[in-house]
Each structure stands twice: as structure tokens, then as C-alpha cells.
Design a protein with these regions (language model features):
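Positively charged n-region of N-terminal signal peptides that target proteins for export
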Residues: 1-5
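Compact beta-sheet-dominated domain cores in extracellular/mature segments
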Residues: 19-134
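Bacterial N-terminal signal peptides
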Residues: 6-14
Length: 134
């Protein structure tokens, strides 16, 4: 019985340590024009599309090739809150079965023709860079 309890405690501690070391798939980045924005760890700006206001995925096929979704491996890899970022993270299942990151209930995307630190498509055809409060 003691061995079982010790083993269970070790598993719990290992799980807690593993989840504590999971790096968030996003960072807060300060853009000269837009102020604090949400970006990938490689400083690629993240966008949302105003046509996706019903918590359903509408950007698929050719749209998703131009606007690649920020996909995550599992819900467990996503923290609901990330230090220094005001807002709530979550996931939504895409039509292909992959999980896409959401921020304040909106699926987030990158733009394929942008490099790190670029913001080229804010307010273009309903796409907006994710601006952060504070």
C-alpha cells in the first residue's frame, strides 16, 4: 500500500513539474505602431478574423493556406491564463481534427507572407492583429 501511495505521489509530482515547464505558444510583443500585440514565440503577429464571431471555423482550405491557424497538440498544452497577458486562452477543433488556439474566444492565425516583427494585414478584409490591453 505504501509503495502504491509513493508511486501515485511521484506521478502527481512529475505531472505537475511537466505542466509547469510547458511554454505558452504565444508571447506579448510590443509593436511600434500597435503597441502590445499577441505573437508567436518567433515574434510573428497573431490575427483574428471578424467573420469568425460565432465560435466556428470559417477559414479553411485556401484561406488557411494564406492564414495558417496556430495549432496546438492538446488542450493540456494551453494555459487558460498566461502571465503578463490579459485575456483567456482556449482551443477549438478545426474541421481537419486539429486543435487551434483561441484568445478571448476567437481563433488566432498568422499571415503566411509576414516575417518576425511584421504587421502587414491589420484591418484588411476583416483581419485584425490581436492587440493586448495594458
Amino acid at each position: 500500500m505504501r509503495l502504491l501511495l509513493a508511486f501515485t505521489a511521484a506521478l502527481v509530482l512529475a505531472g505537475a513539474a511537466a505542466s509547469a515547464t510547458v511554454k505558452p505558444p504565444v508571447i506579448k510583443y510590443r509593436d511600434d505602431r500597435f503597441g502590445p500585440i499577441l505573437a508567436t514565440p518567433k515574434k510573428q503577429a497573431l490575427y483574428y478574423w471578424t467573420k469568425e464571431n460565432d465560435f466556428r471555423i470559417h477559414c479553411k482550405g485556401g484561406c488557411a493556406r494564406l492564414w495558417p491557424p496556430l495549432v496546438v497538440r492538446s488542450k493540456a498544452a494551453v494555459r487558460v491564463h498566461v502571465a503578463g497577458i490579459n485575456g483567456t486562452f482556449g482551443t477549438i477543433r478545426r474541421p481537419d481534427g486539429r486543435l487551434q488556439l483561441t484568445f478571448d474566444r476567437r481563433p488566432v492565425y498568422t499571415y503566411v507572407h509576414e516575417g518576425p516583427t511584421q504587421v502587414l494585414c491589420d484591418d484588411v478584409n476583416g483581419w485584425f492583429v490581436v492587440r493586448l490591453r495594458g
